Amino acid sequence: MRVILAQPRGFCAGVVRAIEIVERALQQNGAPVYVRHEIVHNRHVVENLRNKGARFVEELDEVPHGAVAIFSAHGVAQTVEQDAQARGLDVLDATCPLVTKVHVQGRQYVAAGRRLILIGHAGHPEVEGTIGQIPAEVILVQSEAEVDTLTLPADTPVAYVTQTTLSVDDTRGIIEALQRRFTDIVGPDTRDICYATQNRQAAVRELSEQVDVLLVVGATNSSNSNRLREIGTESGVPSYLVADGSEVRAEWFANARTVGLTAGASAPEEMVEDVIAALRALGPLEVATMSGREEKVEFKLPAKLTQAVAREV
């Protein structure tokens, strides 16, 4: 059997930054440090950080007064920021800069007098954080069908922003539906969706043309990983989401000669290697990597951490 690895795959710059923030906070402050919500949606990453001394909580009332508290890469509402300040917490914000960019865009549109529409999935931490960062009502739209249910007059000045981990194709369809529905509408281009989301989805579309089965390494609660699996399925390829090699099933490959393998933006490369090992246990295996876009994006760490490093030097 032949395995073709997607390129790019796995960790994005926002995830790398978030994990490094937790690790540096532990190095500088000692354990424990407290992280609100999973730092990224991957249990292997979370367990690794937990073993190093990070404690994961859902609400700040679980954090002792004055302790180090880290916001996850998905972002938080302004009320959470205010709560942290009131509790005297030493806050490190690991919100992905591309998510913060969405917050800034949304506030700018509202300040310009437009009603704001957020394209995203209800209940996702990024969506909840974005809604909580906008000082006005935000209308959440999850599908093209929901556009038809909007009651705003067609000439209402509106703007849209999007969750960063959505399907590029689905998002484009919703934007086009909004543009048909409203006569005065502005918003970022679909190219403004996270670079890593676009690159991984494009790689999977290309990969799906070459394989009999697609495996996506990622967590079930990872939005971007689920979108990769969906793209494979929509391309007509049996596609499976696995957390690691233990979830690989031999029957998936009964008639397969070529398997595509990718990973969501929060999935570590060690889990990709674990899946390859599981496939190798099924029989002879040839592994190749597709040609693809090389990513060189890096995001700066919070000044609080870099200043501490400078003092140590």
Curated annotation (Swiss-Prot):
Its EC number is 1.17.7.4. (2E)-4-hydroxy-3-methylbut-2-enyl diphosphate binds at residues 41, 74, 124, 164, 222-224, 266. Its cofactor is [4Fe-4S] cluster. Pathway: Isoprenoid biosynthesis; dimethylallyl diphosphate biosynthesis; dimethylallyl diphosphate from (2E)-4-hydroxy-3-methylbutenyl diphosphate: step 1/1; Isoprenoid biosynthesis; isopentenyl diphosphate biosynthesis via DXP pathway; isopentenyl diphosphate from 1-deoxy-D-xylulose 5-phosphate: step 6/6. InterPro entries: LytB/IspH. Dimethylallyl diphosphate binds at residues 41, 74, 124, 222-224, 266. [4Fe-4S] cluster binds at residues 12, 96, 194. Isopentenyl diphosphate binds at residues 41, 74, 124, 222-224, 266. The active site is at residue 126. Belongs to the IspH family. Catalyzes the conversion of 1-hydroxy-2-methyl-2-(E)-butenyl 4-diphosphate (HMBPP) into a mixture of isopentenyl diphosphate (IPP) and dimethylallyl diphosphate (DMAPP). Acts in the terminal step of the DOXP/MEP pathway for isoprenoid precursor biosynthesis. This is 4-hydroxy-3-methylbut-2-enyl diphosphate reductase 2. The gene is ispH2.
